[in-house]
A protein has these predicted regions:
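Short alpha-helical scaffolding segments that buttress acidic/His motifs in well-ordered protein cores
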Residues: 25-29, 308-309, 355-363
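An N-terminal boundary/leader segment
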Residues: 1-53, 289-291, 364, 482-496
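Short glycine/serine-rich loop/turn segments
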Residues: 71-213, 264-266, 315, 401-419
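Structural helix-boundary/capping segments
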Residues: 31, 35, 164-170, 175-271, ...
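Serine-dependent amide/ester hydrolase catalytic core
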Residues: 13, 301-302, 325-433, 483-492
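Conserved hydrophobic/aromatic pocket- or pore-lining residues that grip, position, or stack substrates
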Residues: 29, 51, 79, 111, ...
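Short, conserved phosphate/pyrophosphate- and ester-handling motifs at nucleotide-, phospho-/glycolipid
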Residues: 18, 79, 219
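Short helix-loop capping/hinge segments that flank enzyme active sites or metal/cofactor-binding pockets
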Residues: 71-91, 250-262, 315-386, 437-453
Length: 496
């Protein structure tokens, strides 16, 4: 039986029905990893021995009847900025290359309680700072659809692993689009939940007021199932929200009749590639024909989202990353005489260029002479953006938008021009600033065969509406754009 094309829920059903053992499921993942990993580079580390041992333990619990559920025995990959007890957690940075946590992130623990088997830690942009997964200390990850293109970022390793069929689903984190944009580039489904839905305990912080953990998978059902599993109130995270409505799978209903969907004119103007715009508007038409009410509207303030985001995120990063100094854990330079030299050389040698750029920017905007002019102004802009969304959601159930302005760029195209890379998040970062949920689903391909993703944005705690609309689209198109075959066999270089 070919297991690699199964979704997480499909695989879970076969494990429960005793058609497949947990060991067979894990071995199928590693067989595919052996086949494609050298080309794709989705993982920073693999835990084959530990995963096979865990598979035996989970199988025993399933056989005893003490463990059931849709994810029991199903393999998962974890983005390498989430702590995993006893397993190196690097944030794809040299400075944490030898860091082994003594505890696991709450989201990881929730998956393990549900019987998930962690097979490895995925590659990412260093400290989640980037949109291409090219800033990793462990080398760039490539897009399985075409190995000359990026998978997006910063959760590019998780998204590439799912797209390359190395694992049925994975966890990512989203600070400014880091789940939705790479999901779009890789032709998979990814959701950033409402801020506070998933505990940030054990997630190594980038921008604490923006970070949120979420799942990436091959279809909407998997995403809803995983989010239902990892969403929980956690006293260890002061921003965690106690929700009673996390039965997300109950929203998987093929029906959008009467749903009001707003399309922001500002998102479909200059800067949006025609090959991205066309399939998204066609997808909107599919929902309209199914009974949804589609209407254009103005969401003008979002044009200020990028400057506001990079001021706020960089300010929080400069504070969060000050703890990495070589004293208690992580990389420490060997060549120093004085303590201040050790700090300086450790951080200079341990951080990559993009991380240094954002730390410097953050330190600048927080400095006494510029705090009011930049940081305070950015916070006010953030509040105004939230107000603009509140006005929109007074009229609409959700907003339909692109997840990215283009399909996946070529490797190296954004590295030499950081501003170009930052603009790749133009449609996603306002969602983080407002703390809203957003889902990306595949809706087409461009002329090169690269995936196009559509983003649905909801009001706070309205993930169910997003899942319902996304699931309906999937049903109406019979998962036409979902990769359910081994595309990596055909992936390769474009002809000259």
């Amino acid at each position: 039986m070919d297991l690699k094309g199964l979704t997480a829920v499909e695989l879970g059903k076969k494990i429960q029905a005793k058609e497949v053992t947990v060991k067979e499921a894990v071995e199928a993942c590693f067989a595919q990893i052996d086949k494609v990993e050298k080309e794709v580079n989705s993982f920073v580390s693999l835990q084959k021995e530990a995963a096979l041992k865990r598979a035996e333990e989970v199988q025993k619990l399933i056989d005893d009847g003490t463990l059931s559920g849709p994810l029991a025995g199903v393999p998962v990959a974890i983005k390498d900025n989430m702590c995993t007890e006893g397993v190196t957690t690097t944030c794809s940075s040299k400075i944490l290359s030898n860091f082994v946590p003594t505890f696991s992130a709450e989201a990881v623990l929730n998956l393990e309680k549900a019987g998930a088997v962690v097979i490895g830690k995925t590659n990412m942009d260093e400290f989640a700072m980037g949109s291409t997964t090219e800033t990793s200390y462990y080398g760039e990850t490539k897009n399985p659809w075409n190995l000359e293109h990026v998978p997006g970022g910063s959760s590019g390793g998780s998204c590439a692993a799912v797209a390359a069929l190395e694992v049925p689903y994975a966890l990512g984190s989203d600070t400014g689009g880091s789940i939705r944009q790479p999901s779009s580039y890789c032709g998979i489904v990814g959701i950033k939940p409402t801020y506070g839905t998933v505990s940030r305990y054990g997630l190594i912080a980038y921008g604490s007021s923006l970070d949120q953990i979420g799942p990436v998978a091959r279809d909407v059902t998997d995403c809803a199932t995983v989010l239902e599993t990892i969403a929980s109130h956690d006293v260890k995270d002061s921003t965690s929200v106690e929700r009673q409505d996390t039965d997300f799978t109950s929203a998987l209903v093929n029906d959008v009749k009467g749903m009001k969907i707003g399309i922001p004119k500002d998102y479909f103007g200059e800067g949006l590639d025609e090959e991205v715009k066309k399939p998204i508007l066609e997808a909107a038409e599919v929902l309209k024909n199914a009974g949804a009410e589609i209407e254009e509207f103005d969401l003008e303030l979002v044009k200020y989202a990028i400057p506001a985001y990079y001021v706020i995120a960089s300010a929080e990063a400069s504070s969060n990353l000050s703890r990495f100094d070589g004293v208690k854990y992580g990389y420490r330079t060997k060549d120093y005489e004085e303590l201040h030299q050790m700090y300086k050389k450790t951080r200079s040698e341990g951080f990559g260029p993009e991380v240094k750029r954002r730390i410097m920017l953050g330190s600048f905007v927080l400095s006494s002479g510029y705090y009011d002019a930049y940081y305070l102004k950015a916070l006010r802009t953030k509040a105004l953006i939230k107000k603009a969304f509140d006005s929109a959601f007074a009229k609409y159930d959700m907003i339909l938008a692109p997840a990215a302005p283009t399909t996946a760029p070529k490797l190296g195209a954004s590295l030499s021009d950081p501003i170009k890379m930052y603009l790749g998040d133009i449609y996603t970062i306002s969602v983080n600033l407002a703390g809203l949920p957003g889902i990306s689903i595949p809706v087409g391909r461009d002329a090169k065969g690269l995936p196009v993703g559509m983003q649905l944005i909801g009001d706070c705690f309205q993930e169910k509406k997003l899942f319902q609309a996304a699931y309906t689209y999937e049903c109406l198109t019979e998962k036409k754009w979902v990769s359910m075959y081994d595309k990596t066999e055909a992936a390769g270089k474009e002809e000259a």
